[in-house]
């Protein structure tokens, strides 16, 4: 099924909207899981669960091969400052507003915030096993990435050409890369402006992706501390540190050292996208529409709040940093 999803995501009319195979995968998985689940052999259930949990962690670790220290250095201090500022503020706003203003549970609020703050569906996938969240919570979080990230692809070029973004090429690239949800959506938005902006935006976006590691480590230690104090009321006596985040960091360092043949790295990246697509499809199969309808409007409201922050708050952060 994941192989079919990858082919589907590569169709021109889907690719033009910046939908990654991960996004297409969860949609196809949800359609299958809700309308055709009766046709799935019972013994497939264990494989679906394994893919959505264990295989997911391995795939997130290998995503580190998309990052290098050289990329982070290329954007300089302004790009790094914007990335840190956007990620930290968006996670904080999403977690607090989601729980206190919109009445969402902790996991849904944090998954939605992660999708907006870091790298879209991939961040949701990385947070899900660390939080031990239910699959339907990941699905609704990804829905906000699809909606508002796609909107950015069309909105940003329009407001730039209207003269409402008074940035030079460097600052404009930092703004787009620092505030749009998915990597593909960043490329889609910036490519409608010019190649130089696209290059800067892509590098800044990958800097945000690199921040996934420290964020996951902080999250893991915070959850352990909360469990030890009994603060969240759950039984997490042996809550693990997200070791796949360590793997992500190690592989990013390996990629920075340029010790692997380029053809091998390219092949691993393609395989990793496929495995991430498998994991996202499996999450979709485990998700029920009734679960999404229950929290849907409030999650979308949180997605809108975070999107407004990215557009306007991100503008202010870029102005201060550049």
From Swiss-Prot:
It comes from the Bacteria. It is found in: Cell membrane. It holds the Pfam family Cons_hypoth698. Signal peptide: none annotated. This is UPF0324 membrane protein BB4178. GO terms for cellular component: plasma membrane. Keywords: Cell membrane, Membrane, Transmembrane, Transmembrane helix. It is a multi-pass membrane protein. Belongs to the UPF0324 family. It comes from Bordetella bronchiseptica (strain ATCC BAA-588 / NCTC 13252 / RB50). The chain crosses the membrane at residues 13-35, 50-69, 76-98, 108-127, 139-161, 171-193, 209-231, 241-260, 273-292, 296-318. The keyword Heme does not apply.
